[in-house]
Design a protein with these regions (language model features):
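N-terminal leader/targeting and accessory segments in enzymes
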Residues: 1-139, 401-403, 417, 430-431, ...
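Active-site beta-alpha connecting loops in nucleotide-dependent enzymes
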Residues: 92-95, 364-366, 383-464, 508-511
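Residue-level signal for inorganic ion chemistry
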Residues: 57, 85, 104, 140, ...
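Phosphate-binding loop of NTP-binding sites
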Residues: 134-270, 274-282, 500-510
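ATP-dependent carboxylate/acyl-activation modules
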Residues: 37-48, 155, 365-369, 391, ...
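Acidic, Mg2+-coordinating active-site environments of NTP-dependent enzymes
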Residues: 115, 120-123, 229-378, 430-433, ...
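Short amphipathic alpha-helix with an adjacent loop that forms part of the alpha/beta core around
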Residues: 472-478
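Short acidic-hydrophobic, aromatic-tinged amphipathic segments that line or gate anion-handling sites
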Residues: 126-132, 461-471
């Protein structure tokens, strides 16, 4: 049994400049959950998120109270705002949320506004902020962090952040303190700030993931969250469009370490030379995870089992081993579990308890998520995002799954890879051809160019399209009920369109 708190009190605004965030449930409360292997999470206790007074809000954003309002929780989305919430108006690249401050907002139960301005007929609470609204939100996040005295775990890396963050929270369920993790992959400035603002008063441990598109972003997130445990999972070729090399990406990820204080813990992947090359501040404690014999927590065994639908893992710490089964496909999950064990055991959870907790792990939505449609198709829904490393791992996952029908890889473009993007797409297609893949579906200009370069466009086992909707219609002509279908692509390719079509369409045998 474990306890995890999620910030279900608001949505990230729709104009976040990075990737789209999944929508949290329409709740103004936080649930603790108990889960056993193979079961859905069951709520056992309902807790309210932290309540903010107008005075606290004004102090947090360095603003002033123009009109006092009652205490309440915080929202950034007028569409999902519920009664007794303050609305934090953020100006984005596409929308200015101040434009939505109307009497209708009051009718929904909004008790106050935090922002630069309100309409003339606004008669509820108003805390005025000066300057950039995003800076004010981050200032409030930093203030919220200063009110929390427990441990904060910050996780970054090129791949596996969300999955590992969830595994860490799950593994920490073996300790006595209540664990709070950021919702989904709220890993940019807005998401991390909202997660900090939502820390419940009775939480003892916080787990946050931190993402970036460019240099300096991780440093800002780390300054706001001030993690006492700082985790770097890996360095890969995502976001190469904004960097000149993998070494530059490594330095950007390494910003999470820069301002670590003496006594802070840095949890590092010993198998990644770029991670290990990063300088550490004086006085920090280094905890290593990986396959190398010198690791504090070592991955001894990672084997595909249950016909490729689960992973058998053996971890070792101080000569003691634990063996457990992760009920989800993908050998890459073993190293994620190793990282989670490194964090949890350092914070006092016994290794055996970590193994027991991780044996109940359920994959994050649209990340190696195994789904069986009513029409008989087995879908590996890995549609949330993609880079060369994660796409290769997904193809390997598909290759490992036992299948009575065809193995089908439906791939969308991998974005933000810079000047060598076509070469990366060619490498992925070559990997598909060398694996036991029976049918390949491709969508996007980059994959189409790569397929042309490799003379694959006219191949009978390759289906191409310029958008996901068209590809879904075409690929369904070739799919049979017993097929296993991987769907993978960058967020901007909207590959969930294909997933939904696979789920909803009746399939006739003999395609």
């Amino acid at each position: 049994m474990y306890s995890i708190l999620n910030p279900l009190f608001s949505h990230a605004p729709s104009f976040i400049k990075t990737t789209r965030r999944p929508k949290p449930p329409l709740l103004s409360s936080i649930s603790l959950h108990s889960r056993s292997s193979g079961e859905e999470a069951k709520p056992i206790l309902l807790l309210l998120p932290p309540i903010w007074t107008a005075t606290e809000i004004a102090q947090a954003v360095n603003g002033r109270i123009v009109q006092c309002g009652p205490p309440g929780t915080i929202s950034t989305d007028t569409r999902t705002l519920v009664p007794n919430q303050w609305f934090f108006a953020i100006s984005g690249e596409t929308f200015d949320a101040h434009d939505f401050i109307t009497p209708k907002l009051s009718e929904k139960g909004c008790i106050g506004v935090i922002g630069n301005r309100v309409s003339e007929n606004w008669n509820k609470g108003f805390v005025s902020t000066d300057g950039d609204s995003l800076v004010s939100l981050m200032r409030m996040g930093s203030y919220a962090r200063s009110r929390f005295s427990g441990e904060v775990v910050g996780v970054t890396g090129s791949t596996g952040k969300t999955t590992t963050k969830s595994m860490i929270a799950l593994a920490l369920g073996g300790c006595e303190k209540k664990v709070y993790e950021n919702f989904g992959n709220w890993n940019n400035e807005i998401g991390v700030a909202l997660s900090l603002i939502g820390i419940p008063g009775n939480a003892g441990l916080v787990v946050l993931e931190m993402g970036m598109d460019s240099k300096g972003e991780i440093l800002e997130l780390a300054r706001m969250a001030r993690p006492s445990v700082r985790v770097i999972l890996n360095v890969g070729n995502s976001h190469l469009v904004n960097f000149g090399s993998l070494e530059e990406i490594a330095m950007a990820k390494g910003e999470i370490l820069v301002e670590a204080k003496p006594g802070d813990v840095c949890v590092l992947n010993a198998d990644d030379p770029l991670v290990m090359s990063l300088p550490l501040p004086c006085g920090v404690k280094k905890v290593l995870f990986g396959r190398n014999t010198g690791c504090d927590v070592r991955l001894v065994v990672a084997e595909s089992t249950d016909g490729g639908r689960a992973v058998q893992v053996v971890l070792e710490k101080n000569g003691k081993r634990v063996k457990f089964r992760i009920p989800s496909p993908g050998l890459h999950l073993a190293l994620n579990a190793c990282a989670a064990a490194a964090v949890a055991t350092h914070l006092g959870v016994p290794l055996t308890q970590v193994g027991h907790s991780l044996s109940t792990f359920c994959p994050v939505h649209m990340r190696s998520e195994l789904q069986v449609a009513k029409n008989g198709i087995t879908i590996v829904n890995d549609a949330y995002n993609a880079n060369p490393t994660s796409t290769k791992a997904a193809i390997n996952l598909l290759n490992d799954i036992e299948c009575r029908g065809k193995r089908v890889a439906i791939l969308g473009d991998m974005l933000e890879l810079g000047s060598n993007e076509i070469k990366f797409h060619e490498m992925i297609l070559e990997h598909c051809c060398n694996a036991h893949i029976d049918l390949i579906g491709l969508v996007g200009t980059r994959l189409l160019t790569a397929a042309k370069n490799l003379n694959l466009v006219e191949h009978k086992n390759v289906v191409v399209a310029h958008d996901a909707k068209t590809l879904a219609l075409e690929i369904l002509k070739w799919i049979d009920p017993d097929d296993v279908v991987l769907v993978k692509g960058s967020r901007g390719m909207e590959m969930e369109t294909v997933v939904n079509a696979l789920k909803e369409t009746e399939i006739q045998s003999g395609n």
